[in-house]
């Protein structure tokens, strides 16, 4: 009887051990299968090309030029909407979960980018296209000359409605004299809100840096197509270098270096080619100039003999037309590349060069 009980116990133990071994084997097999499935999924993803999402039309154009047939590139911003003020929808967020790369401009353009970083899948990568670019301060008032004395005209108490000393080169304002928190110095006007100018793409040199950042990210995410990405980048750089040379040659002959523009989007272009932008509106083109600012722009144009005012596609040109009528200037259209176009980045910049060349000769 005792022997029978022992035999039953041994059999039960053997059965339990066998079940446990089978469960462990199944678990190991499942783990291996999941790993293989994940690897296969990744391989298939690369074979089908990278899934790339961008925040602007410019980053889309650069990414598409580098990816070629090795990737699908989608811009979040819908047709007919500009880069300023865009916010991604829940549908956009779902699309980002499936993206291999999300490429954004940076420089403060996309205030919502941190939310996207939390949304991306674990295999996705977020790329700041403007990384490594020296950013310009934004929010400068129109009468500031880039690299020159901030104020060229005299301020006095007779022609300004200020309660403080009207010397424009001596902004010694205390808190007691103002009811706002803006800091003032000899380089910045009271309309400077301390941000950075996000329009980095308006410099062809910056576009090359952006393209390099994008290519590096593609190679990291898809090393199997490294040769393709590098070859496409080299071809793109040739075109960008040629474009840069065209700008230098044409604008070196400009008789005037001042450009009155709809909003403060041309600082990087101006810096590269020795121009000075006089913006009617600020960085995001959402505010209109007050009567005093309008008067200053008109006076500056008359003093310097500026013959053109540059408007923008998709934007109301009423204020620019008013300034033009007051000064006898002509109106031409310059594109800050903030809305979608049938043309790519290089073609749009070539069009801008033709406009500038004809106006500044």
What is each of the regions a protein language model found here?
Residues 2-9, 15-361:
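Extracytoplasmic metal-acquisition and chelation regions
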């Amino acid at each position: 009887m005792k022997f029978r009980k022992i035999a039953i116990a041994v059999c039960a133990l053997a059965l339990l051990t066998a079940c446990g071994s089978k469960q462990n084997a199944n678990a190991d097999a499942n783990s291996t299968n999941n790993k293989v499935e994940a690897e296969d999924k990744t391989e298939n993803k690369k074979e089908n090309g990278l899934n790339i999402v961008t925040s602007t039309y410019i980053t889309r154009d650069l990414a598409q030029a580098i990816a070629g047939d090795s990737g699908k590139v989608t811009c979040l911003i819908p047709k007919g909407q500009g880069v300023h003020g865009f916010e991604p929808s829940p549908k956009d967020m779902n699309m980002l979960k499936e993206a291999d790369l999300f490429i954004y401009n940076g420089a403060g353009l996309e205030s919502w980018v941190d939310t996207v970083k939390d949304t991306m899948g674990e295999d996705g990568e977020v790329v700041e296209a403007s990384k490594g670019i020296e950013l310009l301060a934004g929010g400068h008032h129109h009468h500031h000359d880039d690299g020159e004395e901030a104020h060229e005209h005299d301020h006095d108490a007779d022609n300004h409605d200020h309660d403080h000393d009207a010397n424009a080169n001596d902004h010694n304002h205390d808190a007691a004299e103002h009811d706002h928190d803006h800091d003032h110095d000899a380089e910045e006007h009271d309309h400077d809100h301390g941000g950075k100018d996000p329009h980095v793409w308006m410099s062809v040199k910056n576009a090359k840096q952006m393209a390099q950042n994008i290519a590096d990210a593609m190679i990291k995410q898809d090393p199997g197509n490294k040769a393709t990405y590098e070859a496409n980048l080299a071809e793109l750089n040739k075109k960008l270098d040629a474009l840069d040379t065209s700008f230098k040659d044409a604008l070196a002959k400009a008789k005037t270096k001042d450009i009155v523009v709809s909003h403060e989007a041309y600082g990087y272009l101006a810096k590269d080619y020795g121009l000075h932008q006089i913006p009617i509106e600020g960085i995001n083109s959402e505010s209109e100039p007050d009567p005093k600012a309008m008067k200053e722009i008109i006076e500056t144009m008359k003093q310097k003999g500026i013959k053109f005012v540059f408007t923008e596609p998709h934007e109301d040109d009423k204020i620019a037309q008013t300034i033009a009528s007051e000064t006898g200037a002509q109106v031409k259209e310059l594109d800050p590349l903030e809305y979608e176009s049938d043309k790519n980045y290089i073609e749009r910049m070539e069009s801008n060069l033709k406009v500038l060349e004809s106006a500044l000769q």
